[in-house]
Amino acid sequence: MHPRTEGDEADLQAARDTKVTFSRGRLTIRTPKAAGRRGDSGSVAIEVRLPNGSRVNGSAATGDFTADGSLGECTLATMDGDIRLDRTGPARLRTERGDVTAKRIDGMAEIVTGSGQVRVDEIDGAAEIKNSNGNTWIDQVTGALHLKVANGNIFVGQAHADVASKSANGDTRIEQVTRGRVDLQTRTGDLEIGINLGTAALLDVNCQAGTVHNALGASDGPDKGAQTVRVRARTGAGDIVIRRAQPV
């Protein structure tokens, strides 16, 4: 732990006032609260080395959280700052103004950002993501995915279960879906869904101002034992594209 800016008196004082305790396997770090209207309590930079799989719970008014390596369950919140993780267990991540990025989350993922980008390479579990202003990118998710976005584009690479997405302004694209239900809604934006080869699709799609492009072709119904995905897509102004997924 050290002052964020060497020689800054407020930062030096903040470092001196920071309390560190360790008891029964629990490490606690508390920095001083902002004092007065200006809230000029100084800033510190803290580096903690933990065993793999450690559980982490942290909050900050202003500050970033960065983690390398594998962690256990994580609960992190910051009013103003980014959250950058490598691999974690179940995660609850929140920032009012900042980006959230993670390589892999094992378990339930709950991610909220007021204004920023969200990018997760892989979620092995279900996920609930809310983004008021910014793009959201999920490469792969194995469980049910729920997305709520006000302004921003949504990209999902591979979805292995249900997907429900609702946005006000922005495009939504799911590159590959194999089974389950897909429910996409946007007020303004294009919707694009790639159906895995060999999967039958039951479509319920509508756009008020735009065009529906269905590249799957007509079918009498799915073959016996075939995977089926039910698609419901609605856009007020934009196109809807239903196509076969590209091989991964």
Regions found by a protein language model. Name each.
Residues 1-248:
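Intrinsically disordered, low-complexity terminal regions
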